């Protein structure tokens, strides 16, 4: 008989818990992984690896010399729990966690737009 996993309340506005249940220990909703630090929004650039996506985060940087803003972007590796399904081009919310591997320090919390 499978046990029912309790969904944690992350108290993040605009992010709903997923409907699927997973047994991933690195899931912020059903596992033991804590979300702390920054929350970012970005577009999924690559979703080819198993349980990992590359998210492109675009932000504005102020250039003091020219008194203008320039658009910069960075690619962030994020863990993808089994209970959340994404495709390339989806807008997702990611949260900072403890390091999961050498390059993965964020996890996907939810999908904003498909």
Swiss-Prot record:
Q: Which UniProt keywords apply?
A: Ribonucleoprotein, Ribosomal protein, RNA-binding, rRNA-binding
Query: What residue ranges carry the coiled-coil annotation?
Result: none
| Entry-linked Gene3D superfamilies | 2.40.50.1000
Choose any GO biological process term that the UniProt entry carries and state it.
Answer: translation
Q: Which cysteines are joined by disulfide bonds?
A: none
Entry keyword annotation includes RNA-binding: yes
Has the keyword rRNA-binding been applied to this entry? Answer: yes
For this UniProt entry, which residues form the secretion signal? Answer: none
List the Gene Ontology MF annotations in alphabetical order.
rRNA binding; structural constituent of ribosome
Mind telling me which GO cellular component terms the entry cites?
cytosolic small ribosomal subunit
Q: Which InterPro entries match?
A: NA-bd_OB-fold, Ribosomal_uS17, Ribosomal_uS17_arc/euk, Ribosomal_uS17_archaeal
Under the subunit heading, UniProt states: Part of the 30S ribosomal subunit.
Main function: One of the primary rRNA binding proteins, it binds specifically to the 5'-end of 16S ribosomal RNA.
Q: Hey, which family's this protein in?
A: Belongs to the universal ribosomal protein uS17 family.
The protein depicted here goes by the name Small ribosomal subunit protein uS17
Organism listed in the record = Aeropyrum pernix (strain ATCC 700893 / DSM 11879 / JCM 9820 / NBRC 100138 / K1)
């Amino acid at each position: 008989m499978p046990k029912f996993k309790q969904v944690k309340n992350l108290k993040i506005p605009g992010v709903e818990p997923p409907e699927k249940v997973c047994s991933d220990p690195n899931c912020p909703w059903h596992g033991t992984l804590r979300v702390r630090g920054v929350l970012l929004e970005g577009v999924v650039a690559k979703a080819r690896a198993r349980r990992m996506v590359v998210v492109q985060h675009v932000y504005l940087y102020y250039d003091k010399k020219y008194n203008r803003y320039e658009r910069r972007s960075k690619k962030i590796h994020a863990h993808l729990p089994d209970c959340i399904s994404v495709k390339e081009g989806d807008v997702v919310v990611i949260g900072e966690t403890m390091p999961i591997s050498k390059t993965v320090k964020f996890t996907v919390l939810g999908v904003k737009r498909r």
